[in-house]
């Protein structure tokens, strides 16, 4: 499943295609959304927001389209009039004079009013988004030490969208490698230096992955491009200590780590 940086880049592409342009045609596959087709025609997409792995498409009339791709949903941008060659099932089409965005295969799609947006169950449940520029390391540290999260092993906590939205498996293993911690560690057991380092890295690595388009390159981690240090690198030498990277399963997901320097 795509993680926060990939979802945000997808939203950027959708925004670049249709933001601020009048919608010339709107189509929904689901019957409960059909009444909104006429309401949205002629309106503008004002912005596309991400909340972890959910997308919120905001319209100029105050409505918001909520969509969660889950495992199979995917958005596409095409030239208006183009007919894509795909076996996927179309769910949403938002068309402007020159560009059209299409949502395929997703099933978790709703139209929300401004009031419903504040009470939506998923949006109420997710934590702050790691790509939200207003989120600070100090706030992350406070969440780590909160009664709700301080006794949770990082192997599960860093996959829990209620803790921080937008994290996922590759971010989990890269974050823990960067600070030299294991999946069994808990926030309550860390010293002040470890807590401060983790609070910063929980934001730094997702943001680095997003801003550098997640490209793999020979540059160093804090250089121009993001590069995996342990993810999918089992059997290779750890660049920090020379130990051999191993693969196991934690919280039902593949977990990559260096036993020599992550202790």
Swiss-Prot record:
Cofactor requirements of the protein: Zn(2+)
Q: Which InterPro entries match?
A: DNA_glyclase/AP_lyase_DNA-bd, DNA_glyclase_Znf_dom_DNA_BS, EcNei-like_N, Endonuclease-VIII, FPG_cat, MutM-like_N-ter, Ribosomal_uS13-like_H2TH, Znf_DNA_glyclase/AP_lyase
Q: Is Zinc-finger tagged as a keyword?
A: yes
Q: Which Enzyme Commission number(s) are on file for it?
A: 3.2.2.-, 4.2.99.18
- What residues does DNA bind to? 70, 125, 169
Quickly give the catalysed reaction: 2'-deoxyribonucleotide-(2'-deoxyribose 5'-phosphate)-2'-deoxyribonucleotide-DNA = a 3'-end 2'-deoxyribonucleotide-(2,3-dehydro-2,3-deoxyribose 5'-phosphate)-DNA + a 5'-end 5'-phospho-2'-deoxyribonucleoside-DNA + H(+)
Q: Which note does the record give on the cofactor? A: Binds 1 zinc ion per subunit.
Pfam families according to UniProt: Fapy_DNA_glyco, H2TH, zf-FPG_IleRS
Query: Zinc fingers (FPG-type): which spans?
Result: 229-263
Tell me the domain of life.
Bacteria
Question: Which parts form a coiled-coil structure per UniProt?
Answer: none
Please name the catalytic residues of this protein.
2-3, 53, 253
Q: Which UniProt keywords apply?
A: DNA damage, DNA repair, DNA-binding, Glycosidase, Hydrolase, Lyase, Metal-binding, Multifunctional enzyme, Zinc, Zinc-finger
UniProt KW Kinase keyword: no
Q: Which GO terms describe its biological process?
A: base-excision repair
**Which GO-annotated molecular functions does the record name?**
class I DNA-(apurinic or apyrimidinic site) endonuclease activity; damaged DNA binding; oxidized pyrimidine nucleobase lesion DNA N-glycosylase activity; zinc ion binding
Describe the family membership recorded for this protein in Swiss-Prot or TrEMBL.
Belongs to the FPG family.
According to its UniProt entry, the function of this protein is described as: Involved in base excision repair of DNA damaged by oxidation or by mutagenic agents. Acts as a DNA glycosylase that recognizes and removes damaged bases. Has a preference for oxidized pyrimidines, such as thymine glycol, 5,6-dihydrouracil and 5,6-dihydrothymine. Has AP (apurinic/apyrimidinic) lyase activity and introduces nicks in the DNA strand. Cleaves the DNA backbone by beta-delta elimination to generate a single-strand break at the site of the removed base with both 3'- and 5'-phosphates.
> Which NCBIfam families does the protein's record reference?
PRK10445.1 (NF007763)
**What is the name of the protein in this document?**
Endonuclease 8
Source organism phylogeny? Bacteria, Pseudomonadati, Pseudomonadota, Gammaproteobacteria, Enterobacterales
Gene expressing this chain: nei
